[in-house]
Amino acid sequence: MVERLLESSASWSNFFIFFGLAVLLLFAVLGFVTYGILAERKVMGFMQGRVGPNQVGGRFGLLQTVADVLKLLLKEDSIPKAADKPLFILAPIIAFAPAFMVLAVIPFTSQFQFADIGVGLLYYIAISGITTIGVLTGGWASNNKYSLLGGMRAAAQMISYEIPLVMSVIGIVLLTGSLNLNEIVASQEKVWYIFAQPIGFIIFLIAAVAELNRTPFDLPEAESELVSGYHTEYSGFRWAFFMLAEYVYLFGMASLMTVLFLGGWNPVLFLDFIPGAVWFALKFSAVVFLFIWFRVTFPRMRGDQLMEFGWKVLLPIALANIFLTALIKELFF
């Protein structure tokens, strides 16, 4: 359906159809964020020997996050007197908008994708980098030393780990010969790239956790050091925008990892009677669970350890993986 709309001439009817689909995707992502946070709290509770949310919405706390969202919307929206007001207001929007934009190129099934462009992988990497500007702007505009430190940490971390993240997928591009995400999924019909590119997968996984600012790489928001990091001065729905961006990126990064390394909607052998959407959802859920598991398990790294690990360990291994992949392809394919 989307492909037919893209091929048709521009019209108001097509505009409203695309707008409706975008709103539908937005609500689907917001639903994931709402219950993804709840799932994370329940899983963390289980791993730490606690119950987790169990009061609002029954014994499983099904409405706990809904209540939290309502609380955030009703909280006072305060702007510090010394803050740069225009930038302070604009920063959460700059941080959130790219998080939603990157979802346009991710193919969730063979039929469901908003924009099947030839350089979908490059588009995702390029657009996701804009969020760094929003985070740094928020830290600067707050006129608070903790916010500024958090923003500078976030910028340094995201730039440092985006390089090995990009390097880790070059092996896949070499094997596939394309930056199109649909073609990457199609090339994994027989063998998933988690088996063909195990080194690339490990590098991508570690760099993805760092890009998401999640434990053990959550230095920009380190509560014990920086109060709340770059969004210390934010409250209410503006603070919610930053949190929303973080969890929408979790949705996007888990989806991208599913597409790049786990075969997307391709089924496991002899189980092709199960719909592709179900396979995508199962693989996606496994990746999200892995991110949550990391958060519960690992302690926070020091800043110097973080930078040293990115530049001195991940980057050389990623470069070696590119060389090895090119050599194997030249010799055996």
From Swiss-Prot:
Entry's PROSITE patterns?
COMPLEX1_ND1_2 (PS00668)
Q: What is its EC number?
A: 7.1.1.-
Return the broad EC class.
translocase
Top-level taxon: Bacteria
Chain segments annotated as transmembrane: 15-35, 88-108, 117-137, 159-179, 191-211, 241-261, 273-293, 313-333
Q: Which UniProt keywords apply?
A: Cell membrane, Membrane, NAD, Quinone, Translocase, Transmembrane, Transmembrane helix, Ubiquinone
* One GO term of the biological process aspect: aerobic respiration
GO MF annotations in UniProt: NADH dehydrogenase activity; oxidoreductase activity, acting on NAD(P)H, quinone or similar compound as acceptor; quinone binding
Q: What does it catalyze?
A: a quinone + NADH + 5 H(+)(in) = a quinol + NAD(+) + 4 H(+)(out)
Q: Report the membrane topology from the UniProt record.
A: Multi-pass membrane protein
GO terms for CC? plasma membrane
Extract the PANTHER family matched here: NADH DEHYDROGENASE SUBUNIT 1, NADH-UBIQUINONE OXIDOREDUCTASE CHAIN 1
Q: How does it assemble?
A: NDH-1 is composed of 14 different subunits. Subunits NuoA, H, J, K, L, M, N constitute the membrane sector of the complex.
Name the job this protein performs.
Answer: NDH-1 shuttles electrons from NADH, via FMN and iron-sulfur (Fe-S) centers, to quinones in the respiratory chain. The immediate electron acceptor for the enzyme in this species is believed to be ubiquinone. Couples the redox reaction to proton translocation (for every two electrons transferred, four hydrogen ions are translocated across the cytoplasmic membrane), and thus conserves the redox energy in a proton gradient. This subunit may bind ubiquinone.
Task: Supply the name of the protein.
Answer: NADH-quinone oxidoreductase subunit H
Q: Which organism is it from?
A: Bacillus cytotoxicus (strain DSM 22905 / CIP 110041 / 391-98 / NVH 391-98)
